[in-house]
Every structure is written in structure tokens, then in C-alpha cells.
Amino acid sequence: MKKMSRWLGGLLAVLLLAGTCAYAQAAPGAVQGSVTVRSAAQSGGMESDELLEGYLYQAAGMTPRVSAAAAAARPALYAVPMQPLTAEVYSGLLPEIREIAAGTRASTQIQVPVSIAYTKEELGVTGTLVADGAITSEANAKISARFRQDLAVDTLLNQLLLRNPYELYWFDKTVGISAGCGISCTGEVCTIVQVTVSMPAAAAYQGGSELTVDTAKTGAASAAAQTAAAVVAGQQGSSDYEKLRAYLTYITGEVSYNSGALAAGTAYGDPWQVIYVFDGDSSTNVVCEGYAKAFKYLCDLTWRSGDPAVQCLLATGTMDGGTGAGGHMWNIVTIGGRNYLADVTNCDTGTAGAPDLLFLCGVRGSATQSYTAAAGGREIRYVYDDHTRSVYDTELELSDTAYDPDAMTPMELLTALTRYVACITDVCPAGADVNGDGQVDADDMTALARTITG
């Protein structure tokens, strides 16, 4: 009995390592076999760090940014048809791929139930399917060719990467995928009931092998998105300015500047910088990229409309002063019709702008040359790099005065005037009492005029 158990255990291990799937319930006299097909490796497209950052946005219900070239290519690629079996396997893979991306599944070897039957006539086998207790070489070759035709693994992989790029941030596309199946043949028909697709994980996400992921890593993005959403939810009912201030305070309270990463020459493009801000771990700190991207992420979560009241952009270039001269990333915040500098990094404890001297502050200079901000008796100089100048236009022109949350914006002035006029001709709406004296009269127009003229 023990010998039989060991034999069965060894057979199971061989089957798992081979990457084949379960066989159909064998009919009397049925003979077993297997087929494996492999896709070509993929290159180009978005890198893993871009995909993870996109997944972070997608996990929060936002649309990730897509390059113009990628967006233009999608309609034609979407139109590529999939064979019925390819489409069936594609549909079966999606729920499992999403679980892997969310950190709730470790294995990247996925079994998809199917129901396939190939008769001798369909396969074009002239001899027998089975002889001497084995599938004949002719039948095996015909089955392999038909399976490769029905399950187009290159098309399958292309469609997965095209339609679900961010959920596959963990996948090593440079290796490709393989698909295997077990075959059960009688004298007249061969059946397949399951296809196993193996999707190797990128080295940065692997668990114990290339066909497993470390769920602590793959679950980090979803957890970060949930934490960020809770931060935003906690500011419901606050004014736009109060929300911005709250996000500044949250970020500088959660992380510190990672001087070690700066010394090591860490390049931009690390999506983990954003995740570290929201992971609740005091040992995972960030450089300027983490501060700036986390601030933008909270803003994007808050103001999602096509014409938001507040817009937050990323700017890269150089900075003299603050945490030191060199490459830097910061934010540009558009609020009240003007653009303001927001350097969250240099508002953290121990920096030149702490706690808020470089947040929505006034600057002097120009977008084409440089901007200089004063902070604690020091002058901090910012210069946009060519990339930032190529992406943005008037958004780079910054206000020379700090944002005043008590001042009325042009839109707010127009709204107040509209309410005042409505009050004269109809029922007074909320906000018509501009000066807050409890009544709507000519004094409110005077208050409006004073606000306009300063």
C-alpha cells in the first residue's frame, strides 16, 4: 500500500512539473497522451514599472494613462479574431489573472476546463488512433497540429497583453506562455477536458519558482489603492484647499526622505515609490518621485471630472537647494484659475520648506528659464527639463503670489453675482449673501466689487 502511494505521488509530481492538465475520465480501453504548445516571447510595449503604476490607478477605478502610439494601435488589434478554443481559454484565464494581480492567488499555472473531441475523420488519420496500448505517431502528430491550430497561443498572449496590460504587470512577457493538455484516445475519438496555461512571473515578483508569485508583493498595489481611497474619503466635505493641505500632511507624516536611495542614484520610474507612501510601513521611505506621485495620485482620486476644479501635474527637472542640488520631481497644482508650485518633498520635516513654505507658494522667474521660491531665508531654484517642457504648455507658467484660500476666484465671483441677480428676481439661492450679514442687498454688490478690485 505504501509503495502504491509513493508511486501515485511520484506520478502526480511528474504531471505537475510537465505542466500538463488533467485527463478526461478514461473510457474502457482508452490510452493517454499529452500535447504542449509554446508562444513566442514578447518584446516592446510598456515596461513592468509602467504597468504596475497603471494597475495602481486601475485598482482605484481610474483610467491609466496610455501613450498615443499604444492607443492608436488598439482598435486594429482588438479586431483580430480568436478561434473558439482560444477565446474559451482566454475567458477562463481572466479571473485567475486578476486574482494573481490582486495578490489573492500565488500559482501562475492556470487550469481551464474545456470540452474537445477529435474523431479520426476530423483529424484525417488514415490508420488507427491507438495501437499496442499507445497513441500512434500519426495520430499524435495530427492531434498536435490540430491543437496548435485551435489554440493559437501567440494570438492568446497578444490579446491578453493588449486587453489586460495592467493586470499582467507581474508576468514575464520576454519568456512567453505555454499551454498543455492531456489527451484520452479510444479507437475512434480523442478527448481533451482541460488546458493548463503556464505564465512565468517576472523575477521581481516570483515566489518560490517562476510559476508562482510572492503575494505580499502582488497584493501591495491593491492595498495601497484601498488606503489612498480611505484618505480621500476622510476629506469628504472639506474645501478643495483643505483637501490639498490634508494630502500634504498625510504624505509627510507617512514617509521620510530616503537619502540612501538618492546616494545610490535611484532613477525615476519606480512605481513602488507610490506604494511605499500608503503601505503603513515606516521603514519603506521614498525620494522626490514618491512624494510627488503620491500627491498626484490622491488628487487624481479626488478630482476625476473632465474639467476638474483642481488639477495636479508632475514636473521633472533640476532643483538647487532644498534636499540638495540635482534631479528633482515636484507638482504643479492648478486651482482658482492659476498654477502653483507644490514641492511636497521639501515640505517634509527637516527640509528648507517645512512644513508648507513650498506648497502653493508664489515664485519669480519664467517657465523658459527658471523659477525661484523663497523658503526660510533660502532661495530654491527650479528648472524644467526638456521632457516636461514638451508635455505641457501654459500649465508651466506659475503664479507669482501664493494661493489665498480666502480670495474668490473669477468663477466664484461669477457664481456669486449670478446668485445675487437671481435673488433680486426670484428666490434667493444659498451664497447670495456675499458679505455674510444675514441679508441680501446693495452691500453685497459692494463686497463683490471690493473683491474684484482687491
Residues of each region from the PLM?
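Sec-dependent N-terminal signal peptides of Gram-positive bacterial secreted proteins and lipoproteins
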Residues: 3-25
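Cellulosome-associated attachment modules in secreted, modular CAZymes
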Residues: 19, 23-27, 404-454
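Intrinsically disordered, low-complexity N-terminal segments that are enriched in acidic
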Residues: 26-198
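Low-complexity, Gly/Ser/Thr/Pro-rich intrinsically disordered linker/tail segments
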Residues: 88-91, 116-130, 353-407
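Extracytoplasmic/secreted proteins, especially bacterial periplasmic and envelope-associated proteins
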Residues: 92, 152-155, 223, 227, ...
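Secondary-structure boundary elements
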Residues: 213-280
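Sec-exported extracytoplasmic/periplasmic mature domains
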Residues: 233, 249-257, 296, 300-304, ...
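Hydrophobic/aromatic-rich core segments of domains that either
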Residues: 290-369
